[in-house]
């Protein structure tokens, strides 16, 4: 069951990234589906224990980090295709975190776990070379992909510490329940002409709904 959940979760992640890449205005689409994700999950907060005080510092830090993650991920897809930007942004962090784990968490993974991470990460990174993408590297796309990779490392470490300071499920629920609201409060101050209205939701309802579902899957 765990293997199935991991695989379907990974596929879902690719799906909402593909829909983001396909969207005409990526910031608007990001605002829309993250807002819908939070609207769907927020009522569940009333059925879970409150997030412990020890976890709130990590929660606030990860919310800020994720604002930058969303902005730069949109930039990635403005300048590069899914088959180029996604493998770099998602493949590199796992390899770097593998090296950082003993220093950050004081833990050493077993050899078979290390090999699994290396094989999967290299498999993702090799997708960059599909369709001859190495011949048409966009420097801006590459730069933004590397920035996103660093951001993913930062929020992965922060979330791991936050989950350890609380219940992992509660921590994730709080994040997904509030993330969309917070991003939509902050985004208008950064992007003056990226308002989203009801007609935008209605026009793109199918893709927004699919992305929202797989975002919280």
Residue ranges with predicted function:
Residues 10, 34-38, 90-95, 117-120, ...:
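Residue-level recognition of pore/gate-forming positions within transmembrane alpha-helices
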Residues 29-30, 85, 171-172:
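Juxtamembrane helix-start motifs in multi-pass secondary transporters
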Residues 140-170:
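Selected transmembrane alpha-helices and immediately adjacent juxtamembrane segments
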Residues 38-41, 98-102, 112-131:
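Hydrophobic transmembrane alpha-helices of multi-pass small-molecule transport proteins
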Residues 1-64, 70-82, 129-144, 177-216:
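Membrane-interface interhelical linkers
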Residues 58-65, 107-121, 167-180:
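Alpha-helical transmembrane segments
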Residues 25-28, 81-82, 105-109, 167-168:
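A helix-boundary/kink motif common to multi-pass secondary transporters
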